From Swiss-Prot:
InterPro entries: DUP/COS. GO terms for cellular component: endosome; fungal-type vacuole; membrane. This is Protein COS6. Residues 1-42, 91-381 are cytoplasmic. GO terms for biological process: protein transport to vacuole involved in ubiquitin-dependent protein catabolic process via the multivesicular body sorting pathway. Keywords: Membrane, Transmembrane, Transmembrane helix.
């Protein structure tokens, strides 16, 4: 027991030291009013934006020298409307290219600072890389990464997921060349920190539900699941879509009578799909929420449908107490909870292909397998 307490104290000390270090760092999110103003500043400082602005000089000369105003007008309109599109595309490609050339340094910073899945651990990494990119002329400003979360997301999309999906060493060398050993070392450090976080999180039982005996699932409060779904998807964000639909029905006379109800059906299915995806996006804001979900599945004593009902109750209470969800109705019942795990966790793991706007959860693969194994054992028991 004393050894475990000492290990936990050491891990807590490490976390506190990392938080103190992150407090000293200054990132663009601390300097700019918002991410939009930061993005505008980055665009303004980019070479492609300056080239676009310089294009107006020969165009203005052409306007003065030309006798026919039609051709200068057409070219000016093209530059005016399509210019910003090309600026944005080339700007994003240049960011991607600059980052791909600095993968080795990216990995060295990860190995040095040992960040975990907590976004705060990435603040030092983001600040150091911002300075390195600017000093070594890899980027023309000191603000490549806006925040620690953007740095962590870049690590996930540039290194973690692409490298983990490579099947053999030859494919890794072909894609990442000389950076392979540095990437392997960085991923090993990252996975070690995530494992520490999981063990600490799973052993301390940092959260336990209180008064769960009185908790009820939404299936007990609503007569039909459709009622629960409609309540979730019919909110203020849907108001513009409904106004558009009412405009088509009552004002426009060009639409056929069949198209109107068909539009409503399609709209309903789109909103239902977005609601399902939104739940996973909300859960993915913090890794600890996903870890809590997997830990709850693994540690559940009940089996079968009753077990999933208990998991749904615990997660509904947890997400409400952590202010992730506005009420205790995240999961409708155990069946909905089981579908959520199978669809957003195990299916992604089996296919090893990310869904739109959702990550692969590479660092959670061992725990997803463990959760699936515990579910299989419970079903056989």
């Amino acid at each position: 027991m004393k050894e475990n307490e000492l290990k936990n104290e050491k891990s807590v000390d490490v976390l506190s030291v990392k938080q103190l270090e992150s407090q000293k760092t200054v990132l663009p999110q601390d300097l700019f009013r918002s991410s939009f103003t930061w993005f505008c500043y980055e665009i303004y400082k980019s070479l492609v934006f300056r080239i676009w602005m310089l294009l107006w000089l020969p165009l203005s000369v052409w306007w003065k020298l030309s006798n026919n105003w039609i051709y200068p007008l057409m070219v000016s309109l093209l530059v005016l409307f399509w210019g910003p599109v090309f600026v944005l595309v080339i700007f994003r490609l240049s960011r991607k290219r600059s980052l791909s050339k600095q993968l080795t340094q990216f990995c060295k910073e990860i190995t040095k600072n040992t960040p975990s899945s907590d976004p705060h651990d990435w603040e030092v990494v983001a600040a150091n890389l911002n300075s390195y990119f600017y000093e070594n002329k890899a980027w023309n400003t000191k603000y490549f990464f806006f925040s620690a979360m953007s740095c962590q997301e870049a690590f996930r999309t540039t290194l973690l997921e692409p490298f983990s999906l490579k099947k053999d060493e030859a494919a890794k060398v072909k894609s990442f060349k000389d950076s392979v050993p540095y990437i392997e070392e960085a991923l090993e450090v990252y996975f070690t920190e995530v494992e520490k976080q999981w063990k600490l999180f799973n052993s301390e039982k940092s959260w336990s539900p209180v008064g769960l005996e009185d908790a009820k699932l939404p299936k007990e409060a609503y007569r039909f699941k459709l009622t629960w779904v409609l309540k979730r998807i019919f909110n203020r964000r849907c108001l513009p879509l409904f106004l558009f639909y009412l405009h088509n029905v009552f004002i426009s006379r060009n639409d056929g009578t069949i198209a109107r109800p068909l539009f409503l059906v399609v709209l309903f299915f789109i909103m239902t799909r977005d609601f399902r995806n939104m739940r996973m996006i909300v859960l993915s804001v913090k890794m600890e929420h996903k870890m809590q979900f997997l830990s709850t599945i693994i540690n559940e004593q009940e089996s079968g449908a009753n077990g999933w009902d208990e998991i749904a109750k615990k997660m509904n209470r947890y997400l409400f107490e952590k202010k992730v969800w506005k009420n205790e109705e995240f999961f409708f019942d155990g069946i909905d909870c089981e579908w959520f795990f199978s669809h957003f966790f195990y299916r992604v793991l089996s296919a090893k292909k990310s869904m739109r706007a959702l990550s692969l959860n590479v660092e959670l693969w061992p725990y997803i397998k463990e959760a699936q194994l515990s579910c299989s054992e419970e079903s056989l028991a």
